[in-house]
Amino acid sequence: TFRDIFERGGEKNWKKILDLVRTDCRDVETMMEKVYLPEYEGGLFNGGAAQMERPNTFIIQQGRAAESVLMEIVKKILAARHPGKVFTIPSNGHFDTTEGNIKQMGSIPRNLYHKELLYQVPEGGKYEKNPFKGNMDIEKLEQLITAVGPENVPLVFTCITNNPICGQPVSMGNIREINRVAHKYNIPLIFDVARWAENCYFIKMNEEGYADKSIAEIATEMFSYCDGFCMSAKKDGHANMGGMVAFRDKGLFWQNFSDFNEDGTVKTDVGVLLKVKQISCYGNDSYGGMSGRDIMALAVGMYESCDFNYMHERVSQCEYLAQGFYKAGVKGVVLPAGGHAVYINMDEFFDGKRGHETFAGEGFSLELIR
């Protein structure tokens, strides 16, 4: 399923081997030939012997656990190579657990978003095109890397959509530029993609050159720019649980975090370290702590998120509610709405009369349900 959506370039190329499982195919030769034995390599999802020899895809039961597995192994490798060294990891907006995991590494998370963009609202509250307020500030990224030194930036993260910035989308052009800058300095680019399908929808609807492309086609291009990703699959996977860590086979992340002998052979494969952590903490790599039912629900849900009509209805509901608040005079409504929620700036709502120590947002929520 992940190969279909993130690597095969659209619905016309999908294999949908899920249907064999869903229809309870009992033909052993068919299942072995199409499901269990095919070998895939070179992308984000190795299969067959390649996944056994160079594991690069790891099912985990939820996103923050997947993130924790990744960051614990990264921490272990960096600590062994550079004891006591403090690293900096930039993002367009670290999710709170990402920021927490980075701090637990002893590293510094940096958020490089456009603060000045977030609360700008045009006359009447309507944008002709989404301004992609979730974009990373590319100039700040270049400045940060050169200021601290590229050797002190082990990873660049990109949160898609930008969860801390009110679920605002990230443009394909911005993703391409983040990739360019990161690779210029030999730094792997890691996506946090809990809401990948929403982001693809926003790109389709608002970015030049993508109107005629499907969500799945856009997803394939988007994922081509990353060296790895962490995912909570409970959002755009339509499932009760699920997550994943994956990195590109023999790509920049693998090169930077594996150890090699003098003759170039692999001494320690970072994928093996991740697999050991996955199995020891969450479950065998065939299920990662998830039930068969949840794995099937996730596989079905991933395809469902590629349905334009579904995604259009979902995102439109958020915009409808946000516009309703704005027209009713509610202060601080963030416009345009993201794809999963409506956000209100509590500083503006309370006219700056509430300090952060008063937990204005929590108080506001309590008043709504009192």
What does each model-found stretch correspond to?
Residues 1-27:
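A structural motif shared across PLP-dependent enzymes of the aminotransferase-like
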Residues 332-370:
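Conserved PLP-binding catalytic core of the aspartate aminotransferase-like
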Residues 19-330, 359-362:
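Conserved PLP-enzyme active-site core in the AAT-like
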Residues 8, 36-42, 368-370:
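Short, intrinsically disordered, charge-balanced linker/junction segments flanking boundaries
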Residues 1-2, 137, 345:
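Helix N-cap / beta->alpha transition motif
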